[in-house]
Design a protein with these regions (language model features):
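Mobile cap/lid helix-loop segments that gate and shape the active-site cleft of serine hydrolases
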Residues: 33, 154, 182-222, 228
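Short amphipathic alpha-helix adjacent to the substrate-entry channel of hydrolases
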Residues: 69-90
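N-terminal cap/lid segment of alpha/beta-hydrolase-fold proteins
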Residues: 18-50, 101
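Primarily recognizes the serine-hydrolase "nucleophile elbow" in alpha/beta-hydrolase
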Residues: 114-187
Length: 292
């Protein structure tokens, strides 16, 4: 009987794996250094040999992981809905906070975008539209890519395509931190001000003792009139990245007259009850509207 249950479990696991999207190109190094944290996978819709608008996806890991671009979680929650709607997807790795402190992570993201623009034809990509999305720490880096679009001081020097632009055309931020310095003011199950918090580890010191570094890592710092449209999605009972992070960010975007929308999910926690089909469809519609 135990063997029968095991075989059924194994078969179901294989069926689920078969349902997940498969990258057309895997482990492309966008920095030319053979490091796993500088690789990406590119997925194409099953729609022939035409070129496709692109969305980058960034996994959430509290900035602690450097090789989760192919996780089942990101495939199900972000990659599959985008592919189903005709978008190509580049799922990227980046340096973790143990590999290097900020701004290394956003430098990696921008290097990946420049690589895509430089090599779009080879990978059937229409680089006239590049969107970006991610959840949690991946939402933070997606938001950073958006608010620092056209900001030369945040480019870094990763890779060999520095002559290409790294701006993005639209951002979907799934519950990403946007202002580290106020995270403990609005409810959380962790102490973000602690020296061992993910945010403190990212900048290399306790955030309240390193306020300049914290502000430099905050997407909200860089909002300006060149900031692209934003769709922000956040659960209202998120106790890891408090809901106030997105609410405050939305207010700042409004003040700068940046096109934006906040979807607040009443029963949404940190990822739980957030990636609903209807919310994934909102993401897709947002990218479609901005890629026309």
């Amino acid at each position: 009987m135990k063997r029968i249950y095991f075989l059924i479990f194994l078969q179901l696991g294989l069926m689920n794996a078969q349902d997940l999207p498969v990258a057309k190109w895997e482990n492309i190094n966008y920095a030319g250094d053979n490091e796993v944290y500088h690789t990406m996978d590119i997925y194409l819709p099953d729609q022939g040999s035409k070129i496709f608008p692109l969305v980058l996806t960034i996994y959430g890991s509290a900035w602690r992981a450097n090789d989760k671009k192919g996780s089942n979680y990101i495939k199900k929650s972000l990659i599959q809905p985008l592919l189903n709607s005709g978008f190509a997807v580049a799922s990227i790795n980046h340096r973790s906070s143990t590999d290097a402190i900020f701004p290394a992570q956003i430098h990696d993201v921008k290097a990946a975008i420049r690589f895509i623009r430089a090599n779009a034809k080879q990978y059937q990509l229409d680089n006239s539209f590049i969107g970006i999305t991610g959840s949690s720490s991946g939402g933070h880096l997606s938001a950073m890519a958006g608010t620092t679009s056209f900001n030369k001081e945040m480019e870094g020097e990763v890779g060999s395509h520095l002559e290409f632009e790294s701006h993005v055309d639209a951002v979907v931020d799934w519950f990403g931190p946007t202002d580290f310095l106020i995270m403990d003011l609005c409810g959380s199950k962790m102490v973000h001000d602690d020296v061992k918090s993910p945010e403190s580890r990212l900048i290399g010191g306790a955030i309240q003792n390193n306020k300049a570094k914290a502000r430099a890592a905050n997407p909200i710092t860089y909002i300006n009139d060149k900031t692209p449209p934003f769709l922000i999605i956040h659960g209202m009972v998120d106790l890891t990245v408090p809901y106030c992070q997105s609410k405050t960010f939305k207010m700042a975007l409004d003040s700068a007259k940046v096109e934006s929308r906040l979807i607040s999910i009443k029963d949404g926690a940190h990822g739980k009850n957030v990636f609903k089909k209807e919310i994934q469809e909102e993401m897709v519609s947002f990218f479609k509207d901005n890629s026309k």
